[in-house]
Curated annotation (Swiss-Prot):
Record InterPro entries: NAD(P)H_OxRDtase_bac/plastid, NADH_UbQ/plastoQ_OxRdtase_su3, NDAH_ubi_oxred_su3_sf
Main subcellular location: membrane
Gene Ontology, cellular component aspect: NADH dehydrogenase complex; plasma membrane
Gene3D superfamilies in the cross-refs: NADH:ubiquinone/plastoquinone oxidoreductase, chain 3
GO MF: NADH dehydrogenase (ubiquinone) activity; NADH:ubiquinone reductase (non-electrogenic) activity; quinone binding
Keyword Lipid metabolism: no
Family according to the record: Belongs to the complex I subunit 3 family.
Membrane topology: Multi-pass membrane protein
Annotated function: NDH-1 shuttles electrons from NADH, via FMN and iron-sulfur (Fe-S) centers, to quinones in the respiratory chain. The immediate electron acceptor for the enzyme in this species is believed to be a menaquinone. Couples the redox reaction to proton translocation (for every two electrons transferred, four hydrogen ions are translocated across the cytoplasmic membrane), and thus conserves the redox energy in a proton gradient.
Transmembrane segments: 5-25, 72-92, 100-120
Keyword terms of this UniProt record: Cell membrane, Membrane, NAD, Quinone, Translocase, Transmembrane, Transmembrane helix, Transport
Pfam families: Oxidored_q4
UniProt protein name: NADH-quinone oxidoreductase subunit A
Length: 128
C-alpha cells in the first residue's frame, strides 16, 4: 500500500487544482450571457434543431447530408490514431518481446498499409 501513496497524493493534488481553477474562474471571470454563447456548437455547423442554413455547401440547410470526404477524413484519422496507440507500446517494449511480436506488428502494419492503399486507390484522399 505504501507504494501507491505518491500516486494517490498526485491524484488528490490534480483534482484539487481542477476544482480550485474552476471555482476561481467562475468567481473572477466575466459573465456576459448572450444567445450565441448558450447555443449548442456542432463542429462549426448550425445546430440541427434551429433549421438555420450552414456554410458547408451552397444552399445547404442543417439536417441535410454533407460531403462524404469529411467522414472519410475522420475515419482515416481514427485508423492512424489507433495504429499509433498499438505501435507506441510495442516500440517501447520491443527488446523484451522477441521475434513473435515483430511478426505480429509486421502483419498489423501490413493490414493498415493495405487499408491505406485501398482508400488511396478509391480516391478517398483527394479533395476535388
Amino acid at each position: 500500500m505504501n507504494v501507491y501513496i505518491p500516486i494517490l497524493v498526485l491524484a488528490a493534488l490534480a483534482a484539487a487544482f481542477a476544482v480550485v481553477s474552476v471555482v476561481i474562474a467562475s468567481l473572477v471571470g466575466p459573465s456576459r450571457f448572450n444567445r450565441s454563447k448558450q447555443a449548442a456548437y456542432e463542429c462549426g455547423i448550425e445546430p440541427a434543431s434551429t433549421g438555420a442554413r450552414t456554410s458547408i455547401g451552397p444552399g445547404a440547410a442543417s439536417g441535410q447530408r454533407f460531403p462524404i470526404k469529411y467522414y472519410l477524413t475522420a475515419m482515416l484519422f481514427i485508423v492512424f490514431d489507433i495504429e499509433i496507440v498499438f505501435l507506441y507500446p510495442w516500440a517501447v517494449s520491443y527488446d523484451s518481446l522477441g521475434t513473435f511480436a515483430l511478426v505480429e506488428m509486421a502483419i498489423f502494419m501490413l493490414t493498415v498499409f493495405v487499408a491505406y492503399a485501398y482508400v488511396w486507390r478509391r480516391g478517398g484522399l483527394t479533395w476535388d
